[in-house]
């Protein structure tokens, strides 16, 4: 894999997304999210079946539970998006052929000094 700006950016997005997922989203919010979803679904089914009052009450309580879980859901979605786009950046960044990797380049003639040659000659004279 070639290391360039895209792969580094992708890696940082993945690391940040995983930290948001595990740091910001605890798994304790999954239970109210599931219960709220089931209650909202049951309320809609009751409302459609003609039981208007119980459908509104059950659906309303479920919606309130879902709204309270909304920051958790948004955080998880944001973390998943960061991991996905980070991975995509890393994969696309490593496919670039125009970017050189971190292979050492040979020194050009302008930067080569003849100090070693002169030092060897100096030592031979002594």
Swiss-Prot record:
GO-annotated cellular components: plasma membrane
Induction per the UniProt record: Induced, via the two-component regulatory system LiaS/LiaR, by antibiotics (vancomycin, bacitracin, nisin and ramoplanin), cationic antimicrobial peptides (human LL-37 and porcine PG-1), Triton X-100 and severe secretion stress.
Domain of life: Bacteria
Gene that this sequence comes from: liaI
Classification of source organism: Bacteria, Bacillati, Bacillota, Bacilli, Bacillales
Its membrane topology: Multi-pass membrane protein
Protein name (database record): Protein LiaI
Key word Cell membrane present: yes
UniProtKB keywords: Cell membrane, Membrane, Transmembrane, Transmembrane helix
Signal peptide residue numbers: none
Protein's cellular compartments: Cell membrane
Positions of transmembrane segments: 11-31, 56-76
């Amino acid at each position: 894999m070639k290391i360039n700006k895209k792969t580094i950016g992708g890696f940082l997005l993945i690391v940040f997304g995983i930290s948001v997922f595990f740091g910001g989203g605890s798994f304790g919010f999954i239970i109210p999210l599931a219960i709220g979803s089931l209650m909202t679904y049951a309320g809609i089914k009751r409302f459609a079946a003609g039981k208007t009052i119980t459908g509104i009450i059950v659906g309303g309580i479920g919606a309130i539970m879902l709204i309270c879980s909304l920051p958790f859901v948004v955080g998880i979605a944001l973390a998943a998006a960061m991991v996905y786009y980070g991975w995509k950046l890393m994969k696309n960044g490593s496919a670039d052929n125009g970017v050189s990797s971190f292979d050492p380049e040979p020194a050009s003639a302008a930067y080569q000094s003849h100090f070693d040659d002169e030092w060897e000659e100096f030592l031979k004279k002594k």
